[in-house]
């Protein structure tokens, strides 16, 4: 009988690992605490490394059709003055998209490869590094465990004791508004910066603003804030940025947290991937 691999978490790292293993005919199951696949919208940029992997998984073309391929990156100061421009082709293709688009195609590919996934399975205990106990009362036995369960990783808490996320002193804001710019724009200001980029061909533009402050809010990127709070935190930028903020239906904020560096991401039959291993 082949070894069974248990993947904890159905985010980007968990689904990507699942696709790779399923493509190689490995026996794996993904366990996800949510009751279904993530449909939370957030912008994400895909660099050449992940683009090559998506191509190997034969889903690159599908992702590209629902995404944007910016041609240049522009650095600006907080009033919009151009500091530097770089053509993306100088270092390879870059894709900007919505996180839920990437999740959808990774999940579809994983299922098509025969991969198994269990939703509503929140891991609450690991016994003998093999026995998985879930909140819903179910249990399962695996030979290897891959912790892909994010910065609040339950797997990591079993892997390393007394290791808690550490607040960096920065808060991030995100949202999806509208803009006709097809560029990646990076604005640099006092104690802060903002990154904006298109995520499809329908004028939808993702933005993320990072500002230094002492507000230790939850590290979850799904905590909703208000437009007024956002504009107050990033008041050093002009109306051209604030109008983008106001065009978003909702805005979200979260504290940026880090963890101590690990000398090894694997211990015994347990391996950490993604934010559970290296959140920053």
What are these model-derived regions, one by one?
Residues 1-13:
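Beta1/beta-strand and adjacent pyrophosphate-binding region of the FAD-binding site
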Residues 2-5, 20-22, 47-176, 214-231:
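Conserved N-terminal helical subregion
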Residues 200, 211-280:
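FAD/FMN-dependent oxidoreductases across multiple families
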Residues 22-41:
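Glycine-rich FAD pyrophosphate-binding loop
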Residues 28-30, 145, 266, 270-272:
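Residue-level marker for buried hydrophobic side chains located in beta-strands
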Residues 168-198:
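Flavin-dependent oxidoreductases
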Residues 13, 36, 152:
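Conserved Rossmann-like nucleotide-cofactor binding loop
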């Amino acid at each position: 009988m082949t070894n069974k691999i248990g993947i904890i978490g159905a985010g980007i790292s968990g689904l990507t690992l699942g696709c790779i293993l399923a493509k190689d005919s490995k026996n794996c199951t993904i366990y996800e605490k949510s009751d279904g696949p993530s449909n939370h919208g957030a912008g994400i940029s895909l660099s050449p490394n992940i683009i090559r992997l998506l191509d190997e998984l034969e889903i690159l073309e599908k992702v590209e059709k629902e995404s944007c391929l910016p041609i240049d990156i522009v650095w600006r100061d907080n009033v919009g003055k151009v500091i530097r421009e770089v053509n993306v082709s100088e270092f390879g293709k870059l894709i900007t998209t919505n996180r839920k688009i990437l999740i959808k195609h990774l999940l579809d590919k994983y299922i098509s490869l025969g991969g198994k996934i269990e939703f509503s399975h929140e891991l609450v205990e690991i016994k003998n590094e093999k026995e998985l106990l879930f909140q819903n009362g179910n249990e399962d036995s695996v030979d290897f465990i891959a912790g892909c369960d994010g910065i609040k990783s339950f797997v990591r808490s079993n892997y390393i004791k007394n290791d808690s996320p550490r607040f960096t002193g920065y808060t991030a804001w995100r949202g999806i508004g509208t803009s006709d710019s097809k560029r990646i724009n990076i604005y640099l200001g006092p104690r802060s910066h903002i990154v904006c980029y298109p995520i499809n061909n329908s004028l939808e533009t993702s933005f993320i603003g990072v500002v230094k402050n002492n507000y230790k809010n939850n590290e979850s990127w799904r905590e909703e804030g208000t437009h007024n709070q956002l504009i107050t935190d990033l008041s050093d930028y002009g109306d051209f940025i604030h109008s983008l903020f106001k065009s978003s239906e909702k805005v979200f904020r979260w504290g940026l947290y880090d963890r101590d560096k690990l000398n090894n991401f694997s211990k015994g039959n347990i391996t950490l991937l993604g934010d559970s291993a290296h959140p920053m």
